[in-house]
């Protein structure tokens, strides 16, 4: 029942707030041995406030709100314990608000909630205490996701691998990122091959092409000479054969003429 209420709340929020952005209906593409992340989130993006086992959420979701000049996350996520010992209304706060605790690695990489680098976009929201290990976002049209291969895998082709949620023929769809991840163990010499491929053009790299151009010219010359000699020998053989056939024809005609004269002399 709770997921239905959550979706109803998200749709109500979008309708009441006057957002004209559309939520992406489908999930982002799932590539084998690859993960994706969003560097920034467009206004209208919704994040579920999911808690780990033994805790329940007080607010259902966070949403990225703002305008073209400023955007930030609203409705901070908080989790409350459901165990009998802690049912005194104690609510856990953000890790950075608790004294004596070191910030997690994710916190150190995440800027404050109101700090935004790109205008009209929200940054990754900071973690909250007893947060679920997996975050569920509801993206809007125009959101860009960046894909990269997992550890131990390498991309078959270099270049940016992005997926963008677009509206195509009235339906929201994610573009397919051009990324294929292959195990690094299958290509042990991939780094050397890539290094030779990515070598900048210069005197050292261009010299092999200069040295190979001369032998290629000699090869073409030798081939042409060979073809000419072959044509010459063929023509010579044809001429000799024609002369032989001509001599044979003369001998045959002479023999036939001699036989006719001999027959005539006998009849007389």
Swiss-Prot record:
One function term, GO molecular function aspect: interleukin-2 receptor activity
Extracellular compartment residues: 22-237
Subunit structure: Non-covalent dimer of an alpha and a beta subunit. IL2R exists in 3 different forms: a high affinity dimer, an intermediate affinity monomer (beta subunit), and a low affinity monomer (alpha subunit). The high and intermediate affinity forms also associate with a gamma subunit.
Alphabetized Pfam families for the sequence: Sushi
Origin superkingdom: Eukaryota
Cited PROSITE patterns: SUSHI (PS50923)
Species for this entry: Canis lupus familiaris (Dog)
InterPro entries in the record: IL-2_rcpt_alpha, Sushi/SCR/CCP_sf, Sushi_SCR_CCP_dom
Domain called Sushi: residue spans: 22-81, 120-183
Disulfide pairings: 24-64, 49-77, 51-79, 122-165, 149-181
Basic and acidic residues bias (residue ranges): 85-102
Gene3D superfamilies xrefs: 2.20.28.230
GN (gene name): IL2RA
Keyword Phosphoprotein: no
Gene Ontology biological process: immune system process; inflammatory response
Function: Receptor for interleukin-2. The receptor is involved in the regulation of immune tolerance by controlling regulatory T cells (TREGs) activity. TREGs suppress the activation and expansion of autoreactive T-cells.
Protein name: Interleukin-2 receptor subunit alpha
Localization in the cell: Membrane
